[in-house]
Amino acid sequence: MIEKDKRTIAFIHPDLGIGGAERLVVDAALGLQQQGHSVIIYTSHCDKSHCFEEVKNGQLKVEVYGDFLPTNFLGRFFIVFATIRQLYLVIQLILQKKVNAYQLIIIDQLSTCIPLLHIFSSATLMFYCHFPDQLLAQRAGLLKKIYRLPFDLIEQFSVSAADTVVVNSNFTKNTFHQTFKYLSNDPDVIYPCVDLSTIEIEDIDKKFFKTVFNEGDRFYLSINRFEKKKDVALAIKAFALSEDQINDNVKLVICGGYDERVAENVEYLKELQSLADEYELSHTTIYYQEIKRVSDLESFKTNNSKIIFLTSISSSLKELLLERTEMLLYTPAYEHFGIVPLEAMKLGKPVLAVNNGGPLETIKSYVAGENESSATGWLKPAVPIQWATAIDESRKILQNGSVNFERNGPLRVKKYFSREAMTQSFEENVEKVIWKEKKYYPWEIFGISFSNFILHMAFIKILPNNPWPFLFMATFMVLYFKNYLWGIYWAFVFALSYPYEEI
């Protein structure tokens, strides 16, 4: 018998790559595993050359089903194929009788499979909602809206079948209620975590840093993908308006994900470069992949540049920049959560962010005379002059030491956003629901009844006067699905159909 406090847990995730959602799944699985629970991750895709180290080295058990299925057709219908791949995965788990091997199944991102699991599994089902999928989809044009409609309805229906729903922030929780107005679920919040261990800085990144920055240089930092919705322009405008940028040794470093095959990345980088020109701020653009191709790093000298654009940097260089920056400028509005501010705070760096979305929960905004002992940065409207004022205020505070960001940031991250804190939240939410009896929904009862009725009629039509299929179904229901009610039904049908007069 399984001990009450040691659970068997399975995660179901669409694509176990190296994104933020994947990092959350890996951290959650590791945290629960370290608490003594038995954990496995099921996914439709996992490339061992492009995944997190804990997956690559076998620290976490991962099984893949359905990777042979396409992810799209001619660059379209991604949601259709994501649904097909997930349903294939779950059907394989059902056929292999794995769905009843777990006390808890955590479904991440895509909810389509939840009703199927609810019918065929005895496990408690938890859905982790990063953000309603229907709000992430683009709906340009009537055809696109019509195309998305059934998937929006499926999302609302499938989420309702979960035993419990959790979300990544109170901001997402409010959005969940506004989106799924007909659901009674009241999600709890489980914050994503940040790895508290430090990343080893590669030698090439140390050399590059010494080449790009002179002794005594200071810089503000922006880390975001080169996309318009990230509003990186706000950082440039605020920096240009700040008093601190007048100093020759002060720079702004803008770095983030960039793919030259993605038109938006290319266009937005050009737009930011043009904006720097408008403010008469000299700038240099460095494509990180070129660094390892060049033997002489002196070609990357940026002595006269006020703004440095860096594309697709390594985790090592990202860590080094966060360690050395004056402050992180986190520009996106209405972020669902936002992990980068936590990465800065864990290193004791202040963060300036927009006063909405996830940062309202992660950053403790400085209020003079009130919270010097706990402040970790500033939350301001996306108004350049207000951000410029915050930049200058941060400089004064760092000089006079009235706020100890080096202490406040790590303390806040460890308390609320560590792997231990996230694991504890998961365990608390599991214990709330895992002891409850399985709920049977009207649609579920109708669906099962209708399916059995159709089978019954099919047997009568295809195999008239043959009772043995009914006995097979009775045995199948009891031994395979552990459904004794329908086992009794089919046994009763068999008894009524058996030709006793031939005995």
From Swiss-Prot:
Carbohydrate-modified residues: N170, N303, N371, N400
Catalytic activity: a beta-D-Man-(1->4)-beta-D-GlcNAc-(1->4)-alpha-D-GlcNAc-diphospho-di-trans,poly-cis-dolichol + GDP-alpha-D-mannose = an alpha-D-Man-(1->3)-beta-D-Man-(1->4)-beta-D-GlcNAc-(1->4)-alpha-D-GlcNAc-diphospho-di-trans,poly-cis-dolichol + GDP + H(+); an alpha-D-Man-(1->3)-beta-D-Man-(1->4)-beta-D-GlcNAc-(1->4)-alpha-D-GlcNAc-diphospho-di-trans,poly-cis-dolichol + GDP-alpha-D-mannose = an alpha-D-Man-(1->3)-[alpha-D-Man-(1->6)]-beta-D-Man-(1->4)-beta-D-GlcNAc-(1->4)-alpha-D-GlcNAc-diphospho-di-trans,poly-cis-dolichol + GDP + H(+)
Molecular functions per Gene Ontology: alpha-1,3-mannosyltransferase activity; alpha-1,6-mannosyltransferase activity; GDP-Man:Man1GlcNAc2-PP-Dol alpha-1,3-mannosyltransferase activity; GDP-Man:Man2GlcNAc2-PP-dolichol alpha-1,6-mannosyltransferase activity; glycolipid 1,6-alpha-mannosyltransferase activity
Keywords: Endoplasmic reticulum, Glycoprotein, Glycosyltransferase, Membrane, Transferase, Transmembrane, Transmembrane helix
EC class name: transferase
A Pfam entry, by short name: Glyco_transf_4
Organism domain of life: Eukaryota
Record's bilayer topology term: Multi-pass membrane protein
A GO biological-process term: dolichol-linked oligosaccharide biosynthetic process
GO CC annotation terms, alphabetical: endomembrane system; endoplasmic reticulum; endoplasmic reticulum membrane
Localization, UniProt: Endoplasmic reticulum membrane
InterPro entries hit by this protein: ALG2, Glyco_trans_1, Glyco_trans_4-like_N
Oligomeric and partner information: Interacts with ALG1.
Role according to the record: Mannosylates Man(2)GlcNAc(2)-dolichol diphosphate and Man(1)GlcNAc(2)-dolichol diphosphate to form Man(3)GlcNAc(2)-dolichol diphosphate.
Note: Present with 1840 molecules/cell in log phase SD medium.
Protein name, per record: Alpha-1,3/1,6-mannosyltransferase ALG2
Species per Swiss-Prot/TrEMBL record: Saccharomyces cerevisiae (strain ATCC 204508 / S288c)
Gene: ALG2
